[in-house]
């Protein structure tokens, strides 16, 4: 029977320590080789937490599945901030151009409940509310209202 281990690791910086080592060690596989493979596959997400699923079958074959980081991590990376605002409704810590919102929406589209780019972009803008990041200089709520009013229909088509 195959064993599955799901962990959240720092992109490009996974180690054989917790949470990976203790979970993979008892499975009798080369933990260092798996960690090196994870680091190669997550290098582009450097500094972000990345969900990784490691599946080990009965013959000790390892299959890695690397997910996409949480939307908050992508928003903060694009905005160039380390930490979200402690008071997101009153104090903004960064600003995203619409292009960055669209890029994140396209990345996350598969795992979102949205059927089109416009609603996916509004979901990303909703995340901006909780992090304290503005969109095109507007609060995320104002940006969502602008999308609803059709202000950015051309870019979101």
Swiss-Prot record:
Statement: the UniProt record of this protein carries the keyword Ribonucleoprotein: yes
Superkingdom of origin: Archaea
Organism listed in the record: Methanocorpusculum labreanum (strain ATCC 43576 / DSM 4855 / Z)
One GO biological process term: translation
Alphabetical list of PROSITE patterns matching this protein: RIBOSOMAL_L11 (PS00359)
CDD domains named among the record's database cross-references: Ribosomal_L11
UniProt keyword terms in alphabetical order: Ribonucleoprotein, Ribosomal protein, RNA-binding, rRNA-binding
MF annotations from Gene Ontology: large ribosomal subunit rRNA binding; structural constituent of ribosome
Subunit structure and binding partners: Part of the ribosomal stalk of the 50S ribosomal subunit. Interacts with L10 and the large rRNA to form the base of the stalk. L10 forms an elongated spine to which L12 dimers bind in a sequential fashion forming a multimeric L10(L12)X complex.
Function noted in UniProt: Forms part of the ribosomal stalk which helps the ribosome interact with GTP-bound translation factors.
Any one annotated GO CC term: large ribosomal subunit
Family from the record: Belongs to the universal ribosomal protein uL11 family.
Gene3D superfamilies: Ribosomal protein L11, C-terminal domain, Ribosomal protein L11/L12, N-terminal domain
Name by which UniProt lists this protein: Large ribosomal subunit protein uL11
């Amino acid at each position: 029977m195959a064993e599955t281990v799901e962990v959240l690791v720092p992109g490009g910086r996974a180690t054989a320590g917790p949470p990976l080592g203790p979970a993979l060690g008892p499975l009798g596989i080369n933990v260092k080789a798996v960690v090196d493979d994870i680091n190669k596959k997550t290098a582009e997400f450097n500094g972000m937490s990345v969900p990784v699923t490691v599946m080990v079958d009965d013959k000790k074959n390892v299959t890695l599945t690397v997910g996409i980081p949480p939307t908050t991590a992508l928003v903060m990376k694009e905005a160039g901030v380390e930490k979200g605002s402690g008071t997101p409704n009153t104090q903004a810590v960064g600003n995203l151009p619409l292009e960055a919102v669209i890029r994140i929406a396209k990345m996350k589209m598969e795992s979102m409940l949205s059927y089109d780019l416009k609603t996916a972009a509004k979901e990303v803008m909703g995340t901006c509310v909780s992090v304290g990041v503005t969109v095109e200089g507007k609060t995320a709520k104002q940006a969502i209202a602008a999308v609803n009013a059709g202000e950015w229909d051309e870019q979101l088509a």
